Swiss-Prot record:
Keywords: Aromatic hydrocarbons catabolism, Dioxygenase, Iron, Metal-binding, Oxidoreductase, Vitamin C. This is Alpha-ketoglutarate-dependent 2,4-dichlorophenoxyacetate dioxygenase. It comes from Burkholderia sp. (strain RASC). Binds 1 Fe(2+) ion per subunit. SUPFAM superfamilies: Clavaminate synthase-like. GO terms for biological process: 2,4-dichlorophenoxyacetic acid catabolic process. The lineage of its organism: Bacteria, Pseudomonadati, Pseudomonadota, Betaproteobacteria, Burkholderiales. The keyword Iron applies. One of its GO terms (molecular function) is metal ion binding. It catalyses: (2,4-dichlorophenoxy)acetate + 2-oxoglutarate + O2 = 2,4-dichlorophenol + glyoxylate + succinate + CO2. Belongs to the TfdA dioxygenase family. Its EC number is 1.14.11.-. Activated by ascorbate. 2-oxoglutarate binds at T141, W248, R274, R278.
Length: 297
């Protein structure tokens, strides 16, 4: 039986109610999920609590897993799998972290619009975030559709952006927040990478903007000018008409396509426990289309 999903937003995001994630998926079910992702870019699975083994097994259906920022963090993990990212305000001893702890700073960085692991090549493909413990209020996650944002740009602006590239760096979003105390080893763990501002999605064939909080500047332009252009594009892309806000329930799993979706966490009381757990798959290396007109991933 094919999976089906109902739109939660006029442009993207589907809720899937007829697929159990705790067991093995058939090849047909994996293809169905990928087809739904190509169209909707975000899928919501309600009432699907997963342990660490189940989450890893589900994620591995969709490609090689990546560790992302763990190369920079260089800290012990609470999890049995290095590929699971701890999206929480909980320290390794299991207690809620102090307000100035790096775990909490990481939560603030996650409240900036970003694409997971855009600071590496290949970058992330899918992220799968599971809700374990939630605060009494706040802590929603927002997603914006970068395909629709690109489509909505004036044609002359699209032409101006064609061929421009931005440099993405793992620590840029942390530096924005004043979190600069990193060793040379940490700073050099993931060198900056260059990405085209406009790319083409390999699954849907749609063009999209590729920006976010890891993008530090536009190559070949003065830093100030490039950053203002990035800010203008982000302001355009995150208009309410392009944004879906997810209010979490324990047991939710949300899956999104980092190639064509930005996301951010929303504010909550950081003294209240909030635990989510993320697995992320790697994408393919970005390549130039056969006609040389766009970058495809």
């Amino acid at each position: 039986m094919s999976i089906n999903s109902e739109y939660l937003h006029p442009l993207f995001v589907g809720q899937v109610d007829n697929l159990a994630l705790q067991g093995a998926l058939s090849p047909a079910e994996v293809r169905d999920v990928e087809n739904e992702m190509d169209q909707k870019a975000v899928l919501v699975f309600r009432g699907q609590p997963l342990d660490q083994d189940q989450q890893i097994a589900f994620a591995r259906n969709f490609g090689q897993l990546e560790g992302g920022f763990i190369k920079v963090n260089q800290r012990p993990s609470r999890f049995k799998y290095a590929e699971l990212a701890d999206i929480s305000n909980v320290s390794v001893d299991g207690k809620v972290a102090e307000a100035d702890a790096r775990e909490v700073v990481g939560n603030f960085a996650n409240q900036l619009w970003h694409s997971d692991s855009s600071f590496q090549q290949p970058a992330a493909r899918y992220s799968m975030l599971s809700a374990i413990v939630l605060p009494p209020s706040g802590g929603d996650t927002e997603f914006c559709d970068m395909r629709a944002a690109y489509d909505d740009l004036p044609e002359d602006f699209k032409k101006e952006l064609q061929g421009l590239r931005a440099e993405h760096y793992a620590l840029h979003s942390r530096f924005i927040l004043g979190d600069t105390e990193y060793s040379e080893s940490q700073r050099n763990a993931m060198p900056p990478v260059s990405w085209p501002l406009i790319r083409t999605h390999a699954g849907s064939g749609r063009k999209f903007l590729f920006i976010g909080a890891h993008a530090s500047h536009i190559e070949g332009r003065p830093v100030a000018e490039g950053r203002m252009l990035l800010a203008e594009l982000l302001e355009h892309a995150t208009q309410p008409k392009f944004v879906y806000r997810h209010s979490w329930k324990v047991g939710d799993l949300v899956m999104w396509d980092n190639r064509c979706v930005l996301h951010r966490g929303r504010r909550y009381d950081v003294t209240a426990r909030r635990e989510l757990r993320r697995a992320t798959t790697l994408g393919r290396r970005c390549r130039l289309s056969p006609r040389g007109q766009s970058w495809v991933q």
